[in-house]
Curated annotation (Swiss-Prot):
Binding site for Mg(2+): D14, G41
EC number: 6.3.4.4
UniProt cross-references to Pfam families, sorted A to Z: Adenylsucc_synt (PF00709)
A single GO cellular-component term on record: cytoplasm
Pathway: Purine metabolism; AMP biosynthesis via de novo pathway; AMP from IMP: step 1/2
Keyword presence, Nucleus: no
Protein name per its UniProtKB record: Adenylosuccinate synthetase
Enzymatic reactions: IMP + L-aspartate + GTP = N(6)-(1,2-dicarboxyethyl)-AMP + GDP + phosphate + 2 H(+)
Gene name tied to this protein: purA
Record's subcellular location: Cytoplasm
Protein's organism: Methylobacillus flagellatus (strain ATCC 51484 / DSM 6875 / VKM B-1610 / KT)
Binding positions for substrate per the UniProt entry: T309, V310, T311, K312, R313, K314, R315
Biological classification of the source: Bacteria, Pseudomonadati, Pseudomonadota, Betaproteobacteria, Nitrosomonadales
Amino acid sequence: MSKNVVVIGTQWGDEGKGKIVDWLTDHAQGVVRFQGGHNAGHTLVIGQGASQKEYKLNLVPSGIVREGVNCYIGNGVVLDANHLLFEIDGLEKAGLEVRNRLKVSPGCPLILEYHVRLDKAREAAREPGRKIGTTGKGIGPTYEDKVARRALRVYDLFYPERFAEKLREVLDYHNFVLTKYLNAEAVDYQQQLDEALSKAPLLQPLVTDISAALYEANKAGQNLLFEGAQGTLLDVDHGTYPYVTSSNCISGQAAAGTGVGPSMLHYVLGITKAYTTRVGGGPFPSELDIETEDSPGFQMSDKGREIGTVTKRKRRCGWFDAAALRRSARINGLTGLCITKLDVLDGIKELNICTGYELDGKPVDLLPVGADDVARCQPVYETLPGWDESTFGISRWEDLPQNARNYLKRLEALCEVPVDIVSTGPERDETIVLRHPFGA
């Protein structure tokens, strides 16, 4: 009987999902993307020593680095065809077999040039204090078109005349916005049409009814791994709105973004760092100074190599926020937690955990809804002793320093979710397993 696992980021993204998805793929026959676009970034480190390889993935599911694992891009993903083909070419040059294992939903909305121009022009027009921190890759405008029912989808590419008609209508609208409101350059219709249609024969062999394919895989007893991108606190409905992404990043989207029923999802694994990070604008109650050497925030930033995979911007760093994690746990219905980057905290004498907030003089034990209230929250901390010993690469619970175990058990109690996995390094075997999501 199959068992299907959903992997979700529980913070503001960048929690280390890629390594965990890759590690879990040992027990899966399929890996599925269900939301976001190429604004997501996963870094996978495979092998050791001279044979070690590093793969940076944006659109292609992490399971592609595993031989024989099928990969699926569901209808909830917005697709930049140029980037997908670029990524496929790069992986094939690295010696991976991709095209006969990768399947794409015909319902994926297409990211086109006008989406990218709109994204960049809007961000440039915002006042400094109100910038979202968008990646400028056209994700948000594409989701807007989807909701407004004017998006062009992968399916449309295979009907050139209809595609041309739809493109003219939507491009007239967006060019008006670009030129009249944003003082940006218009997109040339013929150039956009030719460029988009040129991708049709390259994409067509990949296109499959993902809902049907996943149903049949599940029926055949295959284990499926649903790979979330970004994080719960960036969710368009449940995150620190408006400083969010434009898709739903929560476990429920695994069903909507692929066309499977919720009863096919058996276990939800929440990934969280042992501290907290955030890229771009928006409130961050437990944020620390990352510029002053010898400070905890500097150690998190420096030792944790906290640079965005996609944006190349320094990530903001702060103490672990249990009040925010409790919110994530409830929204996602988490079965278990995976704590990553524990080793980054090695050597910090005292570790603070944000257990709640004070908001307008009143105690609050959950992250509030909406960025304005979150920005006014003052963190309430509990302090635990740190540890001097290295935890890097440890793969057995009993080998962890006692204070590290105490820290993890306290996170477990505060978050009200069992810690099932602890990651102590970037490689597959640098992992402590207390309970395996696939029951292995």
